[in-house]
């Protein structure tokens, strides 16, 4: 990681295009390392990542761009993401590639636990709870379970009391509500 920090501080303009290009590498070890490396570069990589995300049809590259957002957030926890990044994540939820959409959900879930991002992200995750995609609903519910919010309480109550809610989702909701009770005493 020291090498990435050194590159970000001394060779940003030279290293950034190379790291972005490595997201196209077929070797998972290479592109995963590039994702981690991009996270060390900070918020200066967000717009190039958004640009690459918009230009590529490669699902792995799209997912890597999204996962790099999390790495930036991990390394720079106090910085606020631009609205374009949040909107890209919201649009990625509808991507036909499940790796891309689940990566977006994972990233939104991570952001939902950050004090300065939760106001923008919680409503998106609540909206996902109304999806017909059970995997998405499950991910959203599990992310929301760890957030102390009356909006989440209301969402969970609506879902668990609604007749059309899938049985599996109701089980996840019950477990999530129990978790919320132990975390927040709600």
Curated annotation (Swiss-Prot):
Annotated Pfam families: HEAT_2
Keyword Nuclease recorded: no
Annotated TM spans: none
Keywords on record: Antenna complex, Phycobilisome
Intrachain disulfide bonds: none
Highest taxon listed in the record's lineage: Bacteria
Any one cellular-component term (Gene Ontology): phycobilisome
InterPro entries, sorted: ARM-like, ARM-type_fold
Function: Involved in the biosynthesis of bilin.
Name the UniProt record assigns to this protein: Bilin biosynthesis protein CpeZ
Native species: Synechococcus sp. (strain WH8020)
């Amino acid at each position: 990681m020291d090498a990435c920090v050194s590159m970000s501080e001394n060779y940003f303009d030279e290293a950034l295009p190379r790291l972005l290009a490595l997201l196209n590498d077929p070797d998972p070890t290479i592109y995963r390392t590039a994702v981690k490396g991009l996270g060390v570069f900070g918020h200066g990589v967000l717009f190039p990542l958004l640009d690459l995300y918009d230009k590529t049809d490669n699902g792995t590259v799209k997912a890597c761009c999204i996962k790099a957002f999390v790495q930036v957030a991990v390394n720079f926890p106090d910085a606020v993401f631009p609205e374009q990044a949040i909107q890209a994540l919201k649009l990625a939820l509808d991507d036909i590639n499940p790796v891309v959409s689940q990566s977006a959900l994972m990233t939104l879930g991570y952001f939902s636990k950050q004090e300065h991002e939760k106001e923008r992200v919680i409503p998106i995750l609540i909206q996902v709870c109304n999806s017909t995609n059970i995997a998405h609903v499950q991910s959203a519910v599990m992310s929301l379970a760890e957030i102390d919010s009356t909006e989440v309480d209301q969402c969970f109550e609506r879902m668990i009391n609604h007749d059309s809610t899938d049985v599996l989702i109701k089980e996840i909701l019950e477990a999530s509500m129990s978790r919320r009770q132990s975390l927040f005493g709600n």
